[in-house]
Amino acid sequence: MKRILNVTVLAAALLVLFSGCRKESTERLAVGVTAAELEAETYSEIWDVLWRGFDQNYVGWEIEDFDWDESKETYTPKFQELDERVEAINEAETPDSEALEEVETDAAALMHEIFDRFHDGHLFIQYRDYATSQMHAFMPADTRNADREDINDAPKMEKSYYCTPDGEFGGSGEFNYISVSKIMCDLILEKLPQMEADYTRLAGLDSLDVEQEAILEALEAKLPTFRKMKSYMEKNEFYASSLYSMYKDSIGETESALLRLEYDLPTTHFDDDEIASLVIGTTGDNIIYYRLNHFYMPEYRMLELSEYDKLSAADSTVYDTYYAALNQLHDKTYKMHSEGTLKGIILDVRGNGGGMAAHLKWVAGMFYKGERYNLGTMKMKDGLGRLDYSLPSKFYMDCYGTNEEDIDEPIVILTDANSVSCSEITTISVKQHPNGISMGMRTWGGGNKLVDDARYNSILGYAGCIGEYNKTAVYVYLPYILTSYYDLGIIEGVGVAPDIEVRYDNDLYEATGRDNQFERAISYIREGK
């Protein structure tokens, strides 16, 4: 359905505020694909839904170099052949499970052969296998980036930065930090014993009602994560309230010290082994450093437990503490800037997998004056035809709105192969800054915008996904907003190359605790080269 231009442009502006890069959306069905079709059973039916779903909803055809119609003709008979193999195996009195698994493997290979060609960096595909009924899921970008030599170079989240009285994070330097971790850790430690007791009690019952089954299912899913967190906290002597006393006693009073600059925020929003963190520090010669490993705070879903949600009441405290720290960072940065004491800024998004574009305001948005900054242009799906797009509109990043002038001190952003989505948008915003450069390694390659919220589906008619995650036989999380950035163009499947390439030296870190990429950023700001 066509819409007048002003509605499309308004929607585009709104999308920037509420778009993100989560692949766990389960909200909507795509236009043009019915709920019944999403319960496709055979490989041919699944392939048909996928083909039409992409044909009607994908926005990035101009960056692809293959014929989608030809793909339909080429792969349809191949999936039909797989269907026939499954049906022949199942006709036996005792179907051969190994033979079915072979078909499953062949089907997965075909899926990768088809979809690994797509360049979009967020694309996520899941389908229920016809032969085994197992769910298969993959991201083409994972396959593409797996061949990169530097894909596993990312600095460890638990890394400690070294400091000396005259060097990095040493001397009379001031440390600003937040202890959101204490809020989170205390909640987990307080609630975990009751969760364990509830799990033991429910698991021992002979029969359960619907509510009890839901609680038990939630506990079975989440307890392993919480146990890991508890173990992590017990081993981490620097978390929470110990941070302040440790820094206060160490800075300026020791000739050399290893200082852990981490503010750990355990969360089930990510994989079990991930820790969300915010780091804010200032060197002795007034270089501000900050690092975060996600952009999810605008809709932070803390320790979500489905119907067994006992911790969400602390959401507001986490919001307030986190934003207070970022606002404090902003205020301190501009105070030092106005006083002429700010030497430079290092923003570290290495290993940052992205999140919500609304979070950009509190990160890259602090470098610019005004309400917003124009990074490039974007267009979105606007009809079921393969090439039905809206007219291009400007893509803006929100800024603080209170800055009277741009930061004019050097800004360095550290990136690596695992800097994704919002991290890449942030990198571009720094590169476009007159005094900004990027350093490290080329980023992931996923700068398109995504939306999965029902509010915007009602406006646009598109939801950014096909099917429901872990429910329907087919689920695809795909962008329908194509973004082009000034000076760089479309970065899907390409990423953002650094202005100064520096490969991370893990051997150096393991031997000395030194971070060569961080040191190069410090050197650039101090020496201007």
State where each predicted segment sits.
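C-terminal motif of bacterial Sec signal peptides marking the signal peptidase cleavage site
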Residues: 17-20
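Bacterial N-terminal signal peptides that target proteins for export
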Residues: 1-8
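C-terminal "post-core" interaction segments
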Residues: 22-51, 202-206, 226, 282-290, ...
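Flexible, low-complexity junctional segments that flank or bridge functional domains
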Residues: 22-353, 358, 369, 458-465, ...
